[in-house]
Every structure is written in structure tokens, then in C-alpha cells.
Amino acid sequence: MTKTLTIRRPDDWHLHLRDGAMLRAVLPETTAHFARAIIMPNLVPPVVTFAQAQDYHARILAALPEGAEFTPLMTLYLTEDTDPDDVAAAHANGLVHAVKLYPAGATTNSASGVANFDNIRAVLERMAEIGLPLCVHGEVTDDDIDIFDREAVFIDRVLDPIRQATPGLRVVMEHITTRNAVDYATAQDDTLGATITTHHLVINRNHILAGGIKPHYYCLPVAKREEHRLALRAAATSGDARFFLGTDSAPHTDANKLLPCGCAGCFTATNTMSILAHVFEEEQALERLEGFASLHGPAFYRLPANEARLTLTKTPATFPSHIETEDGPVTVFDPGFVPNWTVV
């Protein structure tokens, strides 16, 4: 029986750090285990321009714990007014590694997102030319589309037409939640990748709604039926390089979660690696954890894999129920079981 597991230090290809007091509180939870992360730009106001990305990058570096070795990989928030030349300059500088597409109104702080996709055609064409990936929150926001169907409809109505109209555009389907997304991704070439979160490997929609509503399991895209969770687990543990870790760790204070209209997001930075090792062991795929967490993402983003290592031991993991911030506590994601693996 395996007692220890050593892998290349993992990266998080979808992370929310927020800003200010929240940034200072949650950043150490990520730097404890991860070497790099794709940083989401949905602040208020959003990180739209190269200059704004430079400023946010500086704030992240200033908040790093002493001795931390961590590289924030910045993104720009795509709007219908985004300047293709600004995007190209940000990419050429090496600071910005992706542009993020939020359909207007799809998730937290997405009001500035895209409503008319024809208005971003020039930006997407420039991105295809320079090889800059587009990270996509893949949900339509039409009121007449059921929330559990919005990812599947987005693939047909928006994503596939964008890819057909922009040959060579490199796209990351972020935080996929459906068998539809898994099937679409596995049928594509290497210009398409897909991130899978920790929590979507663990929970289905029953965990949110059955036996009383569980606000701390509410996220967007919302967790789906069990058949979709199982499809995600199969994809994540398959060894297919199209699939890689993006936690979508999304901290909100409890005061902002426990409301009549509470915020969406699960905070998983603290215990992701322990949970993933547990899940991969359940799927008899521990040897593929390194690929999912440490190798597939860098390969897609054309970056070297980390040389540093992370070691886990086969001992039950303990972690706090909350972390404290200046604005109040943030609940750490509870997988509903004690993970069998602990990060050394």
C-alpha cells in the first residue's frame, strides 16, 4: 500500500484571490501548496487593461507571505470595448497569460462581461494570431434556459461557433460540470483544454438542495446530477491531457454567503490537494494525480512543469472549518469525509 506520494508542485489554473483584506487572508492558503495560479480578473472594477493587470499583480506580490515561492499568472477581463493592441502588449510583456470571457451576468462580478459576441471578434482573432488562450465561463444567461442546462446550451450556441469562426484560437473551458462538456472536450484537438474543480468531483446538486439548503456548496456553475459528477471524475482521472486542475477557489465571507441572495463560490484552496489525492485513490488512479494537478496545465499554457516537489502522506487530513479575515470568517469547503492524505 502506498504510504507517501511525491509529485511535481501543482499549479491552480483558475483561482480567485480577491483584493485588499481578503487577498491578504487567502493568498497564504494557495502559496502553501501551489507554485503558480491563473488569477481571475473579476474584481470591482474588473481588471480590463494591461495597466490594471500590472497594478493587481503588484498588489498580489506585496501580499505574499515571507519566503513564499509563487508566481501569479495574470488575466484580462474581456469586454466589448477591449483593445486588441492592449491585449497583445500585455501578452508580449509576459505578464498576462490569458483573457477571460464572462457572459454578462453569468457569475460574481460579471456585469461588465460580453452580451454581443460579434463585438469581440477582433480581439479573438488577435489572440489566435499570438497564441493567447481564451478562458471561458461557459454558461448562457438567458432567463428561459434552466440553470442546470446553461453549460450545455453555451457549448452549442456560443463556444462552438466562436471556435469555428476563429481557427487556431486556444480555449480553456473553465470549471466544466457536465458530461456534455467532457464529451465535447474529448472530441477536440489540442487547441482546447478544460479545467475541473475539486468540489465538482465531490458534490452533486443533492448536496446543495437535499435535506435543507447548503449555502457553502452553492457555486457557479452550479453542481449537476450525479451522472455528471461521475463523468468529471472519469475525465480528471483518465490521464487525458485536455483536463487539468482549476480549483475556482472563490472566497466569500460567511456574511455574504448566508443571505437571502447569497454569493456563489466554494473556498477550496486550503484542502484541495488532500481531497484530490483521496478522490484519485478512490478511482484507483493515484499515479495520474501528478498529470492532472502538475503537468497537463503547464503543457497547455506552454510553460515548463515545476521542478519543486510536493509530498503527501497516507494520514487523515485535518483542516480548519474557517479562516479569519479582517472582514469576517470564510468557510473552508467541507468534502463530507476526512481525506486520507495530508500534505507534508
From Swiss-Prot:
GO terms for biological process: 'de novo' pyrimidine nucleobase biosynthetic process; 'de novo' UMP biosynthetic process. The keyword Transport does not apply. GO terms for molecular function: dihydroorotase activity; zinc ion binding. It comes from the Bacteria. Binds 2 Zn(2+) ions per subunit. SUPFAM superfamilies: Metallo-dependent hydrolases. It catalyses: (S)-dihydroorotate + H2O = N-carbamoyl-L-aspartate + H(+). The modification N6-carboxylysine is found at residue 100. Homodimer. NCBIfam families: pyrC_dimer (TIGR00856). Belongs to the metallo-dependent hydrolases superfamily. DHOase family. Class II DHOase subfamily. This is Dihydroorotase. It comes from Roseobacter denitrificans (strain ATCC 33942 / OCh 114). The gene is pyrC.
